[in-house]
UniProtKB/Swiss-Prot annotation:
Keywords: Transferase. Belongs to the tryptophan dimethylallyltransferase family. This is Indole diterpene prenyltransferase terF. The keyword Endoplasmic reticulum does not apply. One of its GO terms (molecular function) is transferase activity, transferring alkyl or aryl (other than methyl) groups. It comes from the Eukaryota. Pathway: Secondary metabolite biosynthesis. GO terms for biological process: alkaloid metabolic process. Disruption phenotype: The disruption of the whole terpendoles biosynthesis cluster abolishes the terpendoles production. It is an enzyme of class 2 (transferase). Its EC number is 2.5.1.-. It holds the Pfam family Trp_DMAT.
Amino acid sequence: MTIDKKPVTAPESDSKSAAGRKYWTQLCTPILSSLLKSSGSYSAEEQETHIQNLSDYVIPNLGPRPSEAHTKSFLTQSGSPFQPSVNFSSKKTQVRYCWELLGPQGGSDSDPLAVEAAQDILSQLCKAFGYSTRWSDTWLSAFAPTLEEAKSVREMLPKWIATFTGGAELPALKRVPFVFVAFDLDGAKTSMKAYYNPKGKEIATGKPASDLTWKVLRSLTPALSSTAIDLVEKFLAERPVFSAVELVGIDLVDEAGLSDARVKLYVHTENNSFNTVRDYITLGGRLQDETTLKGLAILKDIWHLMLQEPDGTDDDYNKPVNDSTMLCQRAYFSFEMRPGRELPEVKTYLPTWNYVRTDLETIQNYEEVFRRCGFEWGKESKYKELFERAFGPANHDRPKPVHCDASYLYSEKKGIYQTLYFSPPLKDGEEYE
């Protein structure tokens, strides 16, 4: 595939855009560079390639610096629209990052939910990397609120959010996010995924996002297995959760690659007990193959550590969250489907930030996770060194933890497959208004 090296850039017509690019360069570049080096998986030339792609395709589209921004990002707890992550497996360690498509006007009165920004930036990215827009355009069309709907969401958000919070008072929110893009860095190659949030459309129309999601899943070409779709739909219908669908993610690939591309449906639950995890991973007992059960047994051994409970828990324990206004953010699951695959693959996610006591304690818990999984990152202070080189001292007094989310998957091909996601602290005392 030939990559169009013309940068996907926001307009450079004013000092605000230039200041934003400078700020995000100073924040994001050292972090990505540090993680690439610490992982031990990338040559110097490969590292340079990924830093250049960050500069060309991402930095220009993160929006103004926080003190001048129209909105903060909801991708991270710090408000950063850039979320780095590290994938740990029995093979090599890989660095990834996700970012929110905001551009110069995302979150402003002219683009309240950053819909126009996402459409423009995603179109340019697909053109630059030679990706098909067939699936992407389908999800954009289905989930994109009109400008009038986007403006109405601002007024409707407080009532909608109160459904999750039990009446607890929240800071005023003006929007929900719309599109994220993830870059997975493998050697010199970058593969991409796009994530589409149906919440804006759901709030504006009052129609459950799940109804629209099933309709779109069944309309895609190449077609996904109807067996897989029916299986997930029935499972979720038996476990009704308000506004359960969080995101739909797809692989961004060229036209030929669509025949093996993934679609991932993300849902949240209101319970984080291991019994809930078992229920979702096995689809209520429907999946009982050797790989599923082996992965479940491994996860059972580390689940209490992922919940930041090093002394252990029983299988029924539903841990309280740090932020009682975020009752919906207890645990997440994704159901991965591909054309021709009859059964979905289930991946588990935890919003670690809602369980963290301190980043230092979380590091200790994850080093124990890595030891139990047989990863070299469990050696004394190895993971801590990676963390501190990228984000500074683990023992800090920042208001938000750096550890953001975590995911777990076990597959026959890859073995244990775990990713840790981070909220980069903002620089220079910057804050969002």
